[in-house]
Amino acid sequence: MVLASSTTSIHTMLLLLLMLFHLGLQASISGRDTHRLTRTLNCSSIVKEIIGKLPEPELKTDDEGPSLRNKSFRRVNLSKFVESQGEVDPEDRYVIKSNLQKLNCCLPTSANDSALPGVFIRDLDDFRKKLRFYMVHLNDLETVLTSRPPQPASGSVSPNRGTVEC
């Protein structure tokens, strides 16, 4: 009889603990906690900051102008600019790499992005001219709400410092 009573009380305790943890996992996140998990990106400000760091000369040739203006090519062109930035300006002289990466969160994805050719960059001067032209035509970007990547514990080193998550 004593054995059955102690087994029942153990089962009752385990059941109560299970219910308690289950309810805790289902609890809604308060507004204060949501703020820690999200941030806003003012996309038009990022574009203006990039434009301000680039020299004045605009793109003179019209051969790539239409593809740089085309809204369907926005994301694939941005990817090409991020990729080319590391090649033509590895020291990031204009300090625009992180802003280019942040803009990924501002542009919608499309199913055929990988099939599109994107912009062709020859050298640093070509990169600056085309990037400025491209940025000037990103005039309709809005502020977006993005999720923050998990913060590393104090004293730990984050392995992906250069990446930006949306």
Swiss-Prot record:
Region (Disordered) residue spans: 145-166
Q: Which residues are glycosylated?
A: N42, N112
Q: Does Lipid metabolism appear among the keywords? A: no
**Which cysteine residues pair off into disulfide bonds?**
C43-C106, C105-C166
Q: Where in the cell is it found?
A: Secreted
Q: Which InterPro entries match?
A: 4_helix_cytokine-like_core, IL-3
**Residue span of the signal peptide, if any?**
1-26
**Organism domain of life:** Eukaryota
The GO terms describing molecular function are: cytokine activity; growth factor activity; interleukin-3 receptor binding
Could you list this entry's UniProt keywords, alphabetically sorted.
Cytokine, Disulfide bond, Glycoprotein, Growth factor, Secreted, Signal
Instruction: Fetch the Pfam families from UniProt.
Output: IL3 (PF02059)
Cellular component GO terms, alphabetical: extracellular space
Q: What happens when the gene is disrupted?
A: IL-3-deficient animals show no abnormalities. Analysis of steady-state hematopoiesis demonstrates normal numbers of peripheral blood cells, bone marrow and splenic hematopoietic progenitors. However, they show impaired contact hypersensitivity reactions.
Protein's UniProt keywords contain Signal: yes
Predominantly, its location class is: secreted
User: Where in the body, by tissue, does this protein show up?
Assistant: Activated T-cells, mast cells, natural killer cells.
What processes in GO biological process is this protein linked to? B cell apoptotic process; B cell proliferation; cell population proliferation; cytokine-mediated signaling pathway; extrinsic apoptotic signaling pathway in absence of ligand; hematopoietic progenitor cell differentiation; immune response; interleukin-3-mediated signaling pathway
**Family annotation (SUPFAM superfamilies):** 4-helical cytokines (SSF47266)
The similarity comment for this entry is: Belongs to the IL-3 family.
UniProt function note: Cytokine secreted predominantly by activated T-lymphocytes as well as mast cells and osteoblastic cells that controls the production and differentiation of hematopoietic progenitor cells into lineage-restricted cells. Also stimulates mature basophils, eosinophils, and monocytes to become functionally activated. In addition, plays an important role in neural cell proliferation and survival. Participates as well in bone homeostasis and inhibits osteoclast differentiation by preventing NF-kappa-B nuclear translocation and activation.
Give the quaternary structure: Monomer.
Q: What is this protein called?
A: Interleukin-3
